[in-house]
Amino acid sequence: LGLIEKSEDLTRKVSQPELAKMYETAKKLYDAYRAEKKSPLFLNGRAQPIFPYTTGEKSDQDYKYEDSQIVRFPVYVETDYDTDADGKPDLVKAIVQLPKAVAQGDFKAATILEARPYVAGTLDENYVTLESLGLPTDGSYDMKKLHSQPGKRQPVSSATTVEAAKKAKASDWYYYSPYEYIYDYEDLNWYDYFLVRGYAFISSAGLGTKGSEGFNTTGSDLEINAFKNIIEWVNGKRKAYTDKTSNVEIKADWASGNVAMTGLSWAGTTTFGVAATGVEGLKTIVPAAGIASWYDYFNSQGTQFGNAPYSDLSWLSLYVSTRMLDQDDWAGIWQNYSNYINQLNKDQYAHDRNYSDVWKERDYTLHPENLKTSALIVHGLNDDNVKTKHFELMYDALKKAGQDVKLYLHQGDHVYPAAMSRGYGITANGQDFYDLLNTWLTHYLYGVDNHVESLPAVLAQNNYDPSKWASYDNWKSNQRLFLNASSKRLEETISSDYATAGIEIANRNETVSKASSKANLTFVSDVTEDTTIKGHITVHFKAALAKGQGKNFQINALLVDVADEDFDVVGNGSVKQDKTADGFWMGSNLSNLSVAEYETIKTKYKVIAKGWINLANPESGYDSASSRASIEPKVGEYHDYTVYLQPNLYTVKKGHKLALVFNTYDPSDLTVEHPYEVTFKTDSIQAAIPIVEKTRAQKAAYVPSATDTDYANLPEVEGGALVAPEVHYKQEYTLPSPEYFVQPSQTLPEKDEQMQTGSARQEQSHLTLAVSYGPRFVTTTSESVTEDPQEVTSAVGGEQADHMLPQTGSKDHALGLFGVISLTASSLIFWRKKREDA
């Protein structure tokens, strides 16, 4: 709320002027709760939870507009295209949620949109193929028909927001999903935090899903365009209807026109995809574990992740095509849809695993000049589903576009930092993620000047101590650790036959990090100082096919942190069982979340980064489109390769070792029918590792297997230092200057800055509190990094204070400033308790 600083001594006595200003702030909150005509309240640079909440998780007979403080209703937005060939532009269903004050016209609300194809339901993931669904497997389709544009509908009448909300049924958004065993829309309550702070929330599953028309096309321009159309409706530039048949128009007369998109995974993907269209009104995006280019979700440098059907675009389309659950609806489209899926499969595999036009229309990085939004990009550094390359591709594109972009990199896996469905969230230096997101959206959607754009470019959680977060002024690093492979043999050959090499698939990473074998090459280098890796790692080598047939000969490279003794490190991104109850404040009459911490494990190895390339794609670079061309590998014919390992931000401790490992295929993702062998020129192998510390070069010595008794007796081979190849090097964009870390304020801010309130329009003429005033990125455990990391001394001395915002429950403190605050807020707390029964 901004009553005091987080670092305040709660035992000191309060002065009369301080008390008066605290009372003034408390009264603003008190009055906002009771105002007959409500509008968002902004204190301390954040929207405050002054709107009451009621759930939408009810049966039709129990849900009534009159009893609802959050009103809900469906709309059906008309798109541009007729993908299902029924002669009409497709309609996409969207569920709108608003504070009742917004529906009644008290103020115009900013909108959060989650475009998530899973949200209307899914099919059984174990039976998602044409065969298992009883659909034909031999059809074809004219893909140009997907872009047909018949004439638009003509409205016959219109309905107001309140009229639509009064007619709405809970079953429009709360119904049982027979294959998921949950109720959809499952994100119904994921954004309650923002609803009680005066935002509107819209959820849509898009084309081809239950309640909508059209075909799901797995990330294509058609899918993205349909979600873009929802934003255009919010901006008054497109029509929507109250249902699919009556042609009764409904306008977003409640909307300010300012929209943010956020969501995890596919919903994180659509945020970036829609932003790449340049649609007007989309002010900011917060993609979490989103896909930047679908080619790099299913493939890497000419080789695939996984086997069919899970490596097929069509699998995801079938999985979310819940129009099948409505038999009458499905009866009219199944033939065309199955033909479309057959054609999609043919088109995807017509170019093997190379980049093609199928992937081009699902690559959102191609035109960065269209990006006109700010972005807070969120990604788990242990995410093996949507790999970390995607956040870097997004970051690069947004930087090239000159947009304000920040990275929030946590140690989790494929998870949103506020995991509503799991009942917990994470904090960074004491600030929960929703508090950060509140600050971000308050600035970009309501125009409050809270200096959020001055946040550090990168905030990253430490890999060995998750309580620590480091801040960096940019993502790119100009320093490199060069590892030059050193071996007594100029050539080494490995096989795809892991079994013969004595490698168990379950323990492969641990085994190959220790020594070479018939199935892997391992080179090890000592770490002589703490070294922080920041970015993607390039590994150059020269290799040739030694044995095999076909065109898919995957090479999997690993960089591994290895030590003789166990060390602490975050494992696979799972959280501890013990969580801090109620530590993640929600506000209003919402239940708080628990605060979770990522679990560390004791281990002797941790894979830092992985990369995959096909021997058939020597010209493949980092960007997806560079993987268009391939060759027919010939036995004994050498080519130069550069494999790009996934980006990471990872600190390796002094005394550890870095193991650079080469395998054939990655058995965690793929199986191969025919064995193959690959020969490497060992003196060609070099890794260029981006680091925070100064550039240095080291040798990485070949580690023979225990059975390779001849190796010790071989003479040493002197190899020259390898010059990094220029074939794939691309000029980096120039970072804007300056990018700097915001240091914490040592003094209390002026209260007339700290306690700005009222509407966004009123706020804009004042300077409200800076980022460093409230819960902030810097504490006694954080690091601010420019080139070399350095510990930042916080203004907070001794034990860290509680969160700035009110918490559920209380702690005993000496009567003083904290006691005065409690007294001034007691009437507000009592009133909020009374409203919990609403």
Predicted regions and their residues:
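Conserved alpha/beta-hydrolase "acid-adjacent" motif
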Residues: 384-391
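Accessory cap/linker subdomain of secreted extracellular hydrolases
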Residues: 1-51, 60-63, 117, 121-192, ...
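Short beta-strand element of the alpha/beta-hydrolase
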Residues: 107-117, 658
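C-terminal membrane-anchoring or membrane-association module
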Residues: 825-838
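Intrinsically disordered, low-complexity repeat and linker tracts
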Residues: 698-700, 705-818, 836-838
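Glycine/threonine-rich phosphate-binding loop and adjacent beta-strand/alpha-helix elements that clamp
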Residues: 451-744
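Acidic, glycine-anchored loop motifs typical of Ca2+
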Residues: 82-89
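Short beta-strand/loop motif that positions the catalytic acidic residue
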Residues: 371, 377-379, 383
